[in-house]
């Protein structure tokens, strides 16, 4: 693979029709329909733009992927692929795919159904690796919709090419952070332009509310206030699907005495922190009224708009309090529930919990199951934060977590939640983006009817990606990585630190050698235009304690052993991929090389995550030591660890240079490209020359 410039990944990520898809040795089986250049794509004159776009997309697909030139005509008496509407189909976005000798019909319930039907035909031919299709007559329905994602191209950036990529990945709704009319956290955005262009690709657009809302619903001017914000927004964007709300960005001056009644940054009394939670982190008794105010204001301008409220911020609250909140929750508002957060587990008998988005939680936590069950019983429609587009905070600056067997476990539990509690709407990623991958291909096939068995589908995908000879080895490699994710450590200090940025994470010497009484935390260097940038990176590694897990000093030895096991399994997966590589046909090899390259980068991140825990334990033992001789031995270990981490960072440079998506995350921008890895090396070298050398001098004082 060649070296890429920063952001060059964008030229790859939006490619949906791939040269070399067709197997030159493929031959039709008995009874298969063969599409050749005698066929025509039929798009009726005056067709909806989405149907016309489907015709153009299919024409490009056959030209690029199948090496066939097919014309588009409004009618044809000969062999043809016909695009049509069939309004009698039951569900929106559904389509019928009928293939018979000389004719293939894609009939959508609506124009969006035609768009997804076009992709469905492409998927069949992609798996066949040839323009051959079996006779069939099948109605396809989406089991989950909406499937919503933030941009994987750049925060709130949706060029046409990326909208097209979303469609082909089986996703159906864009999510745009919204701070005001045509405003996002990174500046101006013509939101109506996004809405209209997305519509042309069969996609909806959901607003993620970062809007003013600090008003109590009982205040005399409450209606006027909420209408000035939310009614105004939907007067500007009447075609938006709806709005998403979440406690942390929807705080209000609650009168619930269990809370501070203030914003979390203002919850102080004479500078002393109030131990009560602030309203955004508690199921306040008056929160349902606030939600109803927002709903009424939205629906005044857009009667059919979805209003979604996320209870993520109080996952830790006991079930009875959460249930009481839901009893008063507006029934025509959707409740959003996070799959993974709060899942409790024990590692070597030590209690811990998942603190944010993590594939470690292959199975759901009690918060998700109890909240979904209670919402459904109360007649409230549940929405899942599912992360089923493939990314999490496990490794914050990679395009997806390449552990498909573990994702399949999650998919099966989510599907059971759909059957049991109508959890049939997904927020498929947060702002860390998405990427077309084995994970999106699994989701596209599994979250529709007829539903494919995900384990068999994974085998099909592996054969399609890597060829029949290499597929078993690649599947075994993925299985090792999936097993490895069961040994990951999903704590806040890890997901806001070393695992968020990877091997560029700084190693700060914890004893504070200072003449200016300064603090040790340093600002991680990020682009000034970044949505969050350094604000969501904690550089001074330390345990972030909470009541759901044992303290860090008690957890870390077991977590280090767990990460060592993770690294061992990960390296087994790498070895299997290296063994598979020579068996992969040349036309498929780049995908495998990129998968392996990402696996090697993740290995570096695992090493950093393990080393920083050792670093913290050694630093704290050093601070606690009362014996200079013992302290000097500890300092030797710290110095050796620093040097090893420098080499680990240096080893990651080739991996990020070959794939410019590694080390980047939409809301932080670049955090682990070559520059940041070299910055980390300089930072640790500075610690060796400065703090560690000075502390050695201190210990040798006479």
Task: Show which residues each predicted segment covers.
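N-terminal small/glycine-rich loop or linker at the start of catalytic domains
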Residues: 135-152, 210-213, 383-393
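Contiguous, structured surface segment used for ligand recognition
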Residues: 1-142
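Stable alpha-helical elements in mature extracytoplasmic
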Residues: 51-54, 58, 114-117, 159-162, ...
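Short acidic, S/G/P-rich loop/turn micro-motifs used as interaction or catalytic elements
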Residues: 46-50, 88-89, 155, 181-183, ...
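Conserved structural scaffold segments of CAZyme catalytic domains across common CAZy folds
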Residues: 77-80, 85-165, 173, 188-192, ...
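Substrate-binding cleft of carbohydrate-active enzyme catalytic domains
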Residues: 149-309, 320-327, 334-336, 368-370, ...
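Substrate-binding groove of N-acetylhexosamine-processing glycoside hydrolases
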Residues: 2-5, 11-21, 37, 235, ...
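Active-site-proximal beta-strand/loop segments in catalytic clefts of secreted hydrolases
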Residues: 44, 108-109, 177-178, 208-212, ...
